Amino acid sequence: MAALLLLFLFLFASSALSQDSLIGVNIGTEVTNMPSPTQVVALLKSQNINRVRLYDADRSMLLAFAHTGVQVIISVPNDQLLGISQSNATAANWVTRNVAAYYPATNITTIAVGSEVLTSLTNAASVLVSALKYIQAALVTANLDRQIKVSTPHSSTIILDSFPPSQAFFNKTWDPVIVPLLKFLQSTGSPLLLNVYPYFDYVQSNGVIPLDYALFQPLQANKEAVDANTLLHYTNVFDAIVDAAYFAMSYLNFTNIPIVVTESGWPSKGGPSEHDATVENANTYNSNLIQHVINKTGTPKHPGTAVTTYIYELYNEDTRPGPVSEKNWGLFYTNGTPVYTLRLAGAGAILANDTTNQTFCIAKEKVDRKMLQAALDWACGPGKVDCSALMQGESCYEPDDVVAHSTYAFNAYYQKMGKASGSCDFKGVATVTTTDPSRGTCVFPGSAKSNQTLGNNTSALAPSANSTTSGCIPKYYHHPHASFGDLTLLSLLLIIALVFL
């Protein structure tokens, strides 16, 4: 019976992961206070996001994703494209340093070579396919070509006459690049990567495209757009653009190349002339898009064929140049607070970013370590926090450093005090966050995971307010000079206490 139960749970979890992995997020870094890679990963895990796209191959970020199972798209930045395209050795070195050094611990699935090269870096268009081929050859040499795909993201503006979709075609100016590119994608089994922004199509249409049509809002049957050639009905701009890409490939006799949408989103704030960049519209678009993708609705041309889609983007990038809207595409602020709460009823756990009622207290990283240690000692002593989880061999002992241990103790005190104002300060060395700091089997007080692991046994979280015991002895929480004898005696006392409880 136990074996059957475990099998059921495994199959259930696998099914949920498969469903949720259709949605990913882009992680831009043009941010004033960019969270650390470990904080980024913690936020992604709390939101059940299993796919990400990076705009480079940052070492610290790739290390943070190790052993998480998150599927990662890494990128060759545009400024490295020329060098990659001119030398097989340069491409091989890039793959060695940025792929082989991390795979398979970090689940790199795709290498995006450049970004919107045909429309934003036109002078490099002629070398794009060469760069793709050199990277592919390097993967073959490293025996990684079956696990990792190579492609390049395009702006949807390379497609002309996108409505009706059946008449769409690629800008013929780029035929010398597009045709060999599609041949490469077909021969390697790689997807066409496409950036799809109904927001820009709507704004540039000057009122021709209805807002509801851009936002996936329900339309009356007589208001749906109909392709007169195929009689296919289109209820949203997103599907029309994706199908336009399918038809454009068909026009060139490529019919079996899948499409992955590498960017799509809606800005939540704009300048005086950007009237439709609002929180309500951003929430509506992204909520409806995620529902649409997760439900595997597909497109009118390919119904039931899910289009893996990456939301643009995880954080607001406040240092990006351009209009106000360019700085406000994020789902979250850098402190982990959601910009808005997505409406995802029935869409599962992914991006369930209503974290407004789930707050935690963590230690600040760039503060005096002696002040942290003093605050930790107070929390585990006079503060009456149960710090037993920080003992050597227990679930929260690793990493054995004062920041990690202080975070656990500070948060336990904060939760015990009912998140009262002032209970997360500790003389300036602590701060409140909405990102769950739990990791692996180390489940923090206040985490939604604590209900799964502890049930109703809240005694493990913190001692009673009436307790006369300290809950811990300061010296066995990040104290490198505690002796083996001290630890053994304390462990023995704990065992005796547990026996007689």
Curated annotation (Swiss-Prot):
Question: What is one GO biological process annotated to this record?
Answer: defense response
Entry-linked Gene3D superfamilies: 1.20.58.1040, Glycosidases
Instruction: Kindly report the protein's main subcellular placement as a broad class.
Output: membrane
Q: Which parts pass through the membrane?
A: none
Lipid-linked residues (GPI-anchor amidated serine): 470
Using the UniProt annotation, give the residues that carry a glycan (glycosylation sites): 88, 107, 171, 253, 295, 353, 357, 451, 456-457, 466
Q: Which PROSITE patterns match?
A: GLYCOSYL_HYDROL_F17 (PS00587)
Q: Name one GO cellular component term.
A: mitochondrion
UniProt entry keywords in alphabetical sequence: Cell membrane, Disulfide bond, Glycoprotein, Glycosidase, GPI-anchor, Hydrolase, Lipoprotein, Membrane, Plant defense, Signal
Could you tell me what this protein is called? Answer: Glucan endo-1,3-beta-glucosidase 3
In its UniProt entry, the species of origin is given as: Arabidopsis thaliana (Mouse-ear cress)
